[in-house]
Amino acid sequence: MRGLPMGLSIRGLTRTFPGQGRAAPTLALQPTDLDVAPGEFVSILGPSGCGKSTLLRIVAGLDRPTGGHVTLNGRQVTRPGPDRGMVFQSYTLFPWLTVRQNIAFGLRERGLPEAQIRETTEKFIARTGLRGFEEHWPRQLSGGMQQRTALARALANDPEILLLDEPFGALDHQTRELMQELLLEVWGADTPETRKTVLFVTHDIDEAVFLANRVLVMSARPGRVKAEVPVPLPYPRDWTVKTTPDFAALKARLMAEIREEVRKAALA
């Protein structure tokens, strides 16, 4: 792949949804360019309906752009693939499989040796704090434990990029903060050279700043990246970073950016 861009590269990406009946088509994404380096953790922040999830679904290969293209490590994205792992806000575990079986599902579908499946599954059960819950069914789990399992399942497949679409949005505040810390702990367990690339969609400014080393702010629909804010807070991070002046300053800057777009969305 000599000469090809590494990491995630988005160029001229647009998405228009056809209108229903006589309604006009809806432009969800204006031409969008974006680069995410290998191992980078990027949060995407924006008002409801701005195209955040649409952008993520196109990167995942779950939706097709109207224009432009996406490449991951030099390969054009046209369909879903094991090089991209996704975790949704809604609970997406297979209800007929146990925690262990859910985590192992993708590995087994790829036909990997049973010894490798067991080793990898156990590794991510341990990393995500699921010891003692391996044989539970999804209906027996809290929302937080279901999302731990979904995260473990995505990571077990060893994707090149992890795509998270408001994965903690349905959780209570305390559980949400614990899951944020868990995600950073799992992500930071690898060396800087081998860390997963992460694209994380959220409505929550605190969450965006706490997790990422860069936050992108999207405009009201039709969406585009209107601002890019580096987050120079050192890793590893825990909840105490939220009490610092640097965190407050970043939050205030993002609040100013996002309030303008939320106001536009409300008046649209």
Regions found by a protein language model. Name each.
Residues H136-R139, N157:
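Conserved signature/switch motifs of ABC ATPase nucleotide-binding domains
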Residues L45-P47:
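The feature captures the beta-strand-to-loop junction immediately N-terminal to the Walker
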Residues R108, P113-F133, L184-E185:
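Conserved ABC ATPase "signature" region
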Residues A60:
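Helix-to-loop junction immediately C-terminal to a conserved catalytic motif
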Residues G68-P80:
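Conserved ABC transporter NBD signature motif
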Residues V87, L151:
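Hydrophobic anchor residue at the start of the ABC signature
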Residues L97-F105:
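Short coil-to-helix segment of the ABC ATPase nucleotide-binding domain corresponding to the Q-loop/switch region
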